[in-house]
């Protein structure tokens, strides 16, 4: 394990243009090194801050930060916008849209923007009201890499140069637990390539900042331990986004370590030295260009005089109100108390209503936190480890292929599963190598779920993010294409919300998928955890209280939102956001174990409702697969698709043919699928017709000299006009037979070209 320290300094590479750059090396030991380089002064010179970030040589993006000169009026929040622009030229492709240009951001770009926003937003000084926009443009991307984590660092670096008041740079790193023959216990690898990700069983994206000046060591990440350097930089973890890989179950069966809570905690620790290195590089660049913080007018949410008056007026009433267990009753009482405070104090503080309301929220927050820290009770009367009452109803929607209702307290999620052919996979046109997705998870959060009105329509960024988290939690247990050749669309409807609808979606989805007959590798459940910290007692000792199954108010008033999903044996997905300057390792480990205990309790109740896949619904398509020789694929399809279209029309089945000769046949009725299978086999593996064979055929064409009869798919024979009338002479074929007629015929002759001559079979 290397303990060498990097001497990170910015270099003036073009004195005439004023171009500076700084480079940080990410040392992964046996897995090689990666280079992260920041450059400023060449591109986007009119932006307040602009940085070009490189991962090695071929992955390159431009991050710009710009701020309005005047604060935005009439708002009580910080107007930060983060946008990621994916350019198709970055991978040498022309967009596939009609106009051949990029349109609105895709899912990958939206998720990358959220990854940037979550750790960057808390670094801005409180009370800033100027509009700030961070735009990351992907200019070049190596197919072996991802750009999202590089974008976190680039966005932070450009913000450091913008003159905006921030607390310091943010570093982001992707960690993969790679398991191979040389590392059977796994090694955490920073900025892994896609090839290394294929060998991984778990991945983490960790973002954080250094809370005091340190000289970080160059990390090497050996083993599953801390894996990077011997010195411990004081890094505050601000965000974690993590998930198991889609083949983790098979890898564990082969002997790989399971990604348990302990392993996940080790991965977070292993990321810290790399974060410190990236923060040091950003600081070096900002120091070199002499980036000075400009003066901005700040708008604190309330004045101290207002807060003191609100506290004196409302504290006692809020102690009683925040002990009301029912959310609607509590919200109504809280709103009434706030309005009473406004009416009482507005004459004393004219034109400061917004401050009174903000101070009221702060007093409410203090009451909730004090009750948890000192009394050990939460808003609804639970202790720190109790889960709210659970309710489960399976097969709620009559014509859905699978459905389930999952309730946890006042949070209510409806999960609905739809199955279809593999050709219904979602087609992906993005910068990555993925071209399709078989398991699709959509999450909807209508305004009525919180008793409000609002816009409905296309999904917001939050809905896309929550759907992606639930999808990540379930992907590791979705059966393979070979075991279950279906496209699966899972929809989570948040019908009522009071805390962690995303983890409720994971539970509802497991139940719904089982109800649809999907043979999951293991059931998955999720739980949202919270954290409240403060000083208690006369000595002012720091106290950390981890909360299981947090309410919406506990999320808003607490210090951490920590969502964990998994099977009984390992973690499948994790998401962490914290407002603290770091969480002690033992507190994080305790939170993970507390989450596991809750998850096992929920899984047990889910198992009582449904413990294995149900039979598939009669309304769902039943898919069978057969294999045909590759040289027969063209014959099954026919000229311009004639043969396969004919089979589809005659049987009502949907047919998909893969390049390797695998044929998927889908039909709501089993008889249709069997009939289609017989017709395909008759073409691909036919019995060669011979003289004397009899068939009940269908007339497919009439001519002046006879009628063509279909014997097998793709094999027709001719009844000459002289053989149609028996002993009678007929003038027109159409006088005897028409297209579509069924005729019993016998093969009279097959010439050397394979053409078949038929005769009618006499009735006797």
Curated annotation (Swiss-Prot):
SUPFAM superfamilies: Eukaryotic type KH-domain (KH-domain type I), Nucleic acid-binding proteins, Polynucleotide phosphorylase/guanosine pentaphosphate synthase (PNPase/GPSI), domain 3, Ribonuclease PH domain 2-like, Ribosomal protein S5 domain 2-like. Residues 621-680 form the KH domain. Its main location: cytoplasm. The lineage of its organism: Bacteria, Bacillati, Actinomycetota, Actinomycetes, Mycobacteriales. It catalyses: RNA(n+1) + phosphate = RNA(n) + a ribonucleoside 5'-diphosphate. It comes from Corynebacterium jeikeium (strain K411). Its cofactor is Mg(2+). This is Polyribonucleotide nucleotidyltransferase. Mg(2+) binds at residues 555, 561. GO terms for molecular function: 3'-5'-RNA exonuclease activity; magnesium ion binding; polyribonucleotide nucleotidyltransferase activity; RNA binding. Its EC number is 2.7.7.8. One of its GO terms (cellular component) is cytosol. GO terms for biological process: mRNA catabolic process; RNA processing. Belongs to the polyribonucleotide nucleotidyltransferase family. Residues 692-761 form the S1 motif domain. It is found in: Cytoplasm. Involved in mRNA degradation. Catalyzes the phosphorolysis of single-stranded polyribonucleotides processively in the 3'- to 5'-direction. Keywords: Cytoplasm, Magnesium, Metal-binding, Nucleotidyltransferase, RNA-binding, Transferase.
């Amino acid at each position: 394990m290397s303990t060498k320290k990097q001497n990170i300094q910015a270099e003036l590479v073009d004195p005439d243009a004023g171009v500076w750059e700084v480079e940080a090396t990410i040392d992964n030991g046996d897995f090689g090194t990666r280079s992260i380089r920041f450059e400023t002064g060449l591109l986007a010179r009119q932006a307040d801050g602009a940085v070009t970030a490189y991962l090695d040589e071929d992955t390159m993006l431009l991050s710009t930060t710009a701020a309005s000169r005047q604060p935005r009026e009439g708002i009580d929040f910080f107007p930060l916008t983060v946008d990621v622009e994916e350019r198709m030229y970055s991978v040498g492709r022309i967009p596939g849209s009609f106009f051949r240009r990029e349109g609105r951001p895709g899912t990958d770009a939206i998720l990358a923007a959220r990854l940037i926003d979550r750790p960057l937003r808390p670094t801005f000084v409180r009370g800033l009201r100027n509009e700030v926009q961070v735009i990351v443009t992907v200019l070049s991307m190596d197919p072996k890499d991802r750009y999202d984590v590089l974008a976190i660092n680039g966005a932070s670096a450009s913000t450091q140069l913008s003159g905006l008041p921030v607390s310091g740079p943010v570093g982001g790193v992707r960690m993969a637990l790679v398991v191979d023959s040389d590392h059977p216990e796994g090694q955490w690898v920073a900025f892994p390539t896609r090839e290394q990700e294929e060998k991984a069983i778990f991945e983490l994206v960790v973002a954080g900042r250094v809370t005091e000046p340190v000289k970080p060591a160059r990390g090497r990440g050996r083993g599953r331990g801390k894996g990077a350097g011997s010195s411990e930089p004081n890094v505050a973890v601000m965000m974690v986004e993590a998930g198991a890989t889609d083949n983790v179950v098979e890898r564990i069966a082969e002997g790989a370590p399971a990604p348990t809570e302990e392993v996940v905690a080790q991965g977070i620790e292993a990321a810290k030295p790399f974060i410190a290195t990236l923060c040091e590089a950003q600081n070096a660049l900002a120091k070199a260009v002499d980036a000075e913080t400009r003066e901005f007018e700040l708008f604190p949410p309330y004045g101290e005089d207002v807060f003191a008056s609100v506290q004196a007026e409302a504290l006692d009433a809020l102690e009683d109100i925040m002990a009301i267990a029912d959310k609607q009753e509590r919200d109504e009482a809280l709103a009434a108390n706030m309005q009473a405070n406004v009416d009482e104090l507005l004459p004393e503080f004219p034109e400061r209503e917004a401050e009174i309301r903000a101070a009221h929220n702060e007093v409410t927050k203090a009451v909730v936190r004090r009750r948890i820290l000192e009394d050990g009770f939460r808003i609804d009367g639970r202790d720190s480890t109790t889960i709210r009452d659970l309710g489960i109803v399976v097969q709620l929607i009559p014509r859905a292929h699978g459905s389930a209702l999952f309730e946890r307290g006042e949070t209510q999620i409806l999960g609905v599963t739809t199955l279809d052919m593999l050709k219904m996979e979602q087609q992906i046109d993005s910068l990555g190598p993925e071209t399709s997705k078989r398991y699709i998870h959509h999450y909807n959060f209508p305004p009525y779920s919180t008793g409000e009105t609002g816009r409905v329509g296309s999904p917001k960024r939050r809905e896309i993010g929550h759907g992606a988290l639930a999808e990540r939690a379930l992907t590791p247990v979705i059966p393979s294409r070979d075991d279950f050749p279906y496209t699966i669309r899972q929809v989570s409807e948040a019908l009522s919300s009071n805390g962690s609808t995303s983890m409720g979606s994971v539970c509802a989805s497991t139940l719904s998928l089982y109800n649809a007959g999907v043979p999951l590798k293991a059931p998955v459940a999720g739980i949202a955890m919270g954290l409240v910290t403060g000083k208690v007692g006369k000595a002012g000792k720091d106290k950390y209280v981890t909360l299981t199954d947090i309410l919406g108010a506990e999320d808003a008033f607490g210090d951490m939102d920590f969502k964990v999903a998994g099977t009984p044996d390992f973690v499948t997905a994790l998401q962490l956001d914290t407002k603290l300057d770091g969480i002690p390792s033992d507190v994080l480990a305790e939170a993970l174990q507390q989450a596991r205990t809750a998850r096992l309790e929920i899984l047990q109740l889910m198992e009582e409702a449904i413990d294995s896949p149900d039979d598939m619904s009669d309304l769902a398509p039943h898919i069978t697969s057969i294999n045909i020789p590759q040289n027969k694929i063209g014959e099954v399809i026919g000229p311009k698709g004639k043969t396969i279209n004919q089979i589809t029309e005659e049987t009502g089945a949907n047919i998909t043919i893969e390049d390797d000769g695998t044929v998927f046949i889908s039909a709501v009725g089993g008889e249709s699928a069997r009939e289609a299978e017989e017709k395909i086999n008759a073409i691909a593996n036919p019995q060669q017709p011979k003289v004397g064979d009899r068939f009940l055929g269908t007339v497919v064409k009439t001519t002046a000299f006879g009628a063509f009869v279909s014997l097998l798919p793709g094999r027709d024979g001719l009844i000459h006009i002289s053989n149609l009338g028996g002993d009678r002479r007929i003038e027109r074929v159409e006088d005897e037979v028409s297209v579509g007629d069924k005729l019993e015929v016998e093969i009279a002759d097959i010439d050397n070209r394979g053409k078949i001559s038929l005769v009618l079979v006499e009735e006797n």
